[in-house]
């Protein structure tokens, strides 16, 4: 086998592999510290390298964006080596993504052992004027999850969305998006329902908005959200707004998060186009 190229961005690697599959060339991705592209049929090496040169110069070309659909399957020509579960989790995420997951788990365990009321008193939004200078309280409600289902749901989506964003755009952008959403969403929740709220839901929806819109407007960023997932998240938001899960007030935080994500993505893509 012949190694063709190594990618830091797995989405770019998959886009190239999917496109070559539509051209009748089967490539294999082997995932280590980078995503390495391997070719079994070395007789096609020159053709693949020529295509690679064009791909690296024009990663946003529509031919690559539609390749997965043309093949009729989402993993056309794509074969991964199996790696331990935790290694796969780490490979998909950066330090901020993993750190937030760890803190949420620790907070949930503390709530289970010490008791939810006590931990909530430590981490809740400032519920008394004397607490307004305890600055961590404007962010720490993100760590509070009041059910195991809520924790699992939010952490899975956080990992799925925040990981690629951090790897593609950087930890700074993820931190900014998280802090802005925590502050704005917290103010909204406090005004509507008081200080006793928590969870990553608002940030998850900010990530949905950001990843989707930036991926649509700037494909070369390496960000991409399948439209099926976008539709699912919007339906979930609508169902929550009807109060079918018993907490309509939390929906304001989710809507605010989505709008923040969309606004930040629009701002970033406009700035990127001006620089060009």
From Swiss-Prot:
Compartments where found: Cell inner membrane
One Pfam family hit: Rhomboid_N
Keywords: Cell inner membrane, Cell membrane, Membrane, Transmembrane, Transmembrane helix
Mode of membrane association: Multi-pass membrane protein
Top-level taxon of the source organism: Bacteria
Transmembrane regions listed in the UniProt entry: 94-114, 142-162, 168-188, 192-212, 225-245, 252-272
A GO term from the CC aspect: plasma membrane
GO molecular function: serine-type endopeptidase activity
One GO BP: proteolysis
UniProt similarity note: Belongs to the peptidase S54 family.
PANTHER family membership: RHOMBOID PROTEASE GLPG, RHOMBOID-RELATED PROTEIN
NCBIfam families from the UniProt entry: PRK10907.1, rhombo_GlpG
UniProt-recorded name of the protein: Rhomboid protease GlpG homolog
Species of the source: Cronobacter sakazakii (strain ATCC BAA-894)
Organism taxonomic ancestry: Bacteria, Pseudomonadati, Pseudomonadota, Gammaproteobacteria, Enterobacterales
